[in-house]
Amino acid sequence: MSVELAYQQVLTVPLPQIFGRRYWVIAPITEVIGQEGEWGTTVGQTRTIKMSDGASMLETLTVIEKPNRFGYTIGNVKGVLKLLVSAATGVWAFEPDGAGVRVTWSWDVTPTTVGRAMMPVFAKLWSGSANQAMDELGKILQP
């Protein structure tokens, strides 16, 4: 698979497809609303992510460097997560790796005052959820 194809597939995959399973207390994403046009065409593009427990958050694209990386921020967090997280930033990066592509996903979570004390636990839960999502993404990216 080419870097270009991996970039495009990760950027445009429906979020419920890769985050559709609960991981302990982290609810699955059930839908994305408010997105105008194809996702990933413009820096500043936004969409609202809705989760099965009623939580929601606003995702804003902040970086588009096709085909090497794209980045986003998460804000306007509502629901249970609002107690722990005030915002987050993330970056997906793509680079050739032998005959394939290395896909990396990094993030930085800004905790609330209350959430600061819970971050070690939240970090373990989030890492598990992220690993689960990467497994789902791996299935999609298989040639």
Language model: regions and residue ranges:
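Short beta-strand segments that buttress and anchor functional surface loops
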Residues: 44-52, 72-79
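Beta-strand/loop substructures that line and gate deep hydrophobic ligand-binding cavities in soluble
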Residues: 74-128
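Short, highly charged C-terminal tails/helix-capping segments
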Residues: 27, 31, 135-143
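Hydrophobic ligand-binding cavity/cleft-lining segments
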Residues: 1-39
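A short, structured loop/turn motif at beta-sheet edges
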Residues: 1-4, 62-69, 93-104, 139-143
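Short hydrophobic/aromatic-rich beta-strand segments that constitute the beta-sheet cores
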Residues: 49, 59, 69-74, 103-105
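Short acidic/polar mixed-charge low-complexity motifs
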Residues: 53-55, 99
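A generic structural signal for short beta-strands and their flanking turns/coil linkers
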Residues: 43-45, 55-57, 66-70, 88-90
